[in-house]
Design a protein with these regions (language model features):
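Amphipathic alpha-helical polymerization modules
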Residues: 1-112
């Protein structure tokens, strides 16, 4: 079982990655009408799994999305980005709740 510091570290990495993902989504939406713009996404799930398996640090990566391009070369789908934004928001709330729970447990352990 992971200790509190490890759990908090994993949750912190997750929250940081979700913030990066939100920034990428916002950037994609801002460029929905920019000719030639290629949407990006942040991948961290595989990095987190590898770091947990190896016991090392995890890093999020920003990679281009492989969607089909429109005639102007832009591959941003507004409906996809809006859906991703909602999913990201729910994931952020879940991680935030888990982090609050961890701090509550630590507080209870300290104060008795």
């Amino acid at each position: 079982m992971a200790d509190a510091a490890e759990s908090i570290g994993i949750l912190q990495f997750s929250l940081d990655s979700l913030v990066q993902q939100q920034q990428a989504i916002a950037n994609n939406i801002a460029n929905v009408n920019t000719p030639g713009y290629q949407a990006t996404k942040v991948t961290f799930e595989s990095s987190l799994a590898k770091a947990l398996a190896d016991g090392g640090a995890a890093t999020a990566q920003i990679v281009p999305e492989g969607l089909a391009s429109a005639s102007d070369g832009n591959n941003v789908s507004l409906s996809t980005e809006m859906t991703l934004m909602q999913v990201n928001s729910l994931q952020s709330q879940t991680v935030d709740n888990a982090l609050s729970d961890q701090f509550s447990i630590l507080s209870d352990a300290i104060t008795g």
